[in-house]
């Protein structure tokens, strides 16, 4: 949303705004400690129910085709900044979703340099090294772009797990749209030759 003038939105946001574009940055790896979202451009004064955000994360986890990892993770958003007492402050909204499965990947995903003189460490790293690309993913392009020797350095970001960060940020964007009187809805019109009436 670029430079939109907004009338008083709700009893929680009794101001006129010139709203800049929303900007989303995500970070973290699939098997790292956490996935992070930073959503910049939300106005101050939006009332947000974190149960609603967590409900969106829960719906994401129950989607068709989810991996067995969904039984390990129980996605809950933790606010690191930009929200105080349930009200946005206008600062960049910083969200974290912990990866519980990271406990099983501490040596493989460590941010510190491993002891390359330790044969056990070398064996563990070599055993988890990925050299084959997943079809239809960013693995090949990312490995070429960044000149990685281990595909894991790409696939940890190009993972379905990263969508948790987008879903959490999207729940906050929905709150903003609703404050503006905008509702988003969808339905399937047709699948192949079968259409709804």
Where are the model-predicted features located?
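Generic N-terminal targeting/processing segments that precede catalytic cores or assembly contacts
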Residues: 17-197
